[in-house]
């Protein structure tokens, strides 16, 4: 259901059913038994999260019955996670989801470990347990499960993310800096730069950590096989256009970033931006893009406008001569240039 219409209808039906169940005053144990069968056996995922959404209608007795049914099923299905039977795996997943709801509702960390951790077959389970603990404000437990996860999988990005978040929630920004820096070191990306900023600003030491981040990224750009893509990204993120330009022209960077940089410098440095557009034309023409000729004309138009405004028309004329000489055997392209009077 790509349009989402069926999902909306199911959600609406669930709401109506919940309200009707509350008004009908049905025996809570019978209601729990019936709803449990629907949630665990339906192929359309109808009436999901019943333990939470129908809490009022179920009442204490109904919720107890729901929990009992799920726990009984889990004893049978516990080891079916790798079963070849898809129906069995699906039912196990749904029962586990119900027991996770119960654990969250009861703020039961031990149960969360069992049903969210689910044997910790994958390192991501540690992050999931820590997140679930954080969701129910069990922050000490969240830190503990992050630490356990990192002991097993020190490179797991998600565990580091959760640890930063929980440290900040606990009012420990200085302790959040270590995992935040670990993540930044790996990618030097704007999202991790922002995560580092959040921790450092909370610890009132952003100036120091900002310098460290740029120094580290600059050092990486000086590597023998590296270009300045990551450094340019950070400077662009910080609106430091001239620093980005210097890094890009000295060490090179990804063409998409150079194009972004040219677009943002058009007003202040029109000739340099035009030069970027003109130099990008060969890449466009040598690609397999369907509309590469139209894109070439678009780049030429932008360069022409910028150079005319900067009284550098001769540069554009020279670029046209070279383009016609190099690609004169492309009649469709030549026709498009002729149509523009070039």
Q: Model segments located where?
A:
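Eukaryote-biased, non-catalytic alpha-solenoid scaffold regions
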Residues: 1-342
């Amino acid at each position: 259901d790509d349009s989402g219409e069926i999902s909306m209808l199911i959600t609406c039906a669930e709401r109506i059913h919940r309200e009707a169940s509350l008004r009908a005053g049905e025996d809570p144990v019978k209601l729990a038994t019936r709803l449990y069968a629907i949630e665990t056996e339906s192929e359309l995922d109808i009436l999901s999260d019943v333990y939470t959404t129908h809490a009022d209608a179920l009442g204490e007795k109904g919720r107890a019955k729901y929990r009992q049914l799920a726990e009984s099923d889990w004893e049978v299905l516990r080891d079916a996670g790798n079963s070849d039977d898809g129906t069995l795996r699906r039912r196990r997943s749904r029962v586990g989801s119900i027991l996770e709801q119960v654990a969250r509702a009861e703020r039961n960390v031990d149960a969360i470990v069992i049903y969210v951790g689910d044997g910790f077959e994958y390192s991501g389970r540690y992050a999931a347990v820590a997140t679930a603990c954080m969701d129910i404000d069990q922050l000490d437990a969240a830190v503990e499960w992050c630490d356990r996860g990192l002991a097993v999988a020190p490179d797991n990005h998600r565990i580091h993310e959760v640890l930063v978040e929980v440290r900040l929630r606990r009012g420990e920004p200085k302790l959040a800096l270590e995992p935040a820096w670990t993540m930044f070191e790996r990618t030097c990306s704007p999202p991790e730069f922002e995560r580092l900023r959040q921790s450092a600003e909370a610890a009132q030491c952003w100036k120091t950590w900002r310098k460290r981040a740029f120094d580290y990224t600059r050092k990486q750009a000086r590597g023998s096989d590296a270009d300045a893509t990551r450094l340019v990204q950070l400077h662009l993120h910080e609106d430091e256009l001239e620093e980005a330009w210097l890094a890009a022209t000295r060490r090179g960077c990804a063409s998409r970033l150079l194009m972004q940089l040219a677009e943002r410098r058009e007003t202040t440095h029109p000739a340099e931006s035009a030069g970027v557009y003109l130099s990008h034309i060969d890449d466009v023409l040598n690609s397999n893009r369907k509309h590469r000729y139209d894109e070439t004309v678009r780049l030429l138009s932008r360069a022409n406008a910028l150079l005319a405004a900067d009284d550098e028309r001769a540069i554009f004329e020279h670029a046209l001569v070279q383009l016609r000489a190099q690609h004169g055997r492309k009649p469709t392209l030549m026709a498009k240039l002729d149509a523009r009077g070039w």
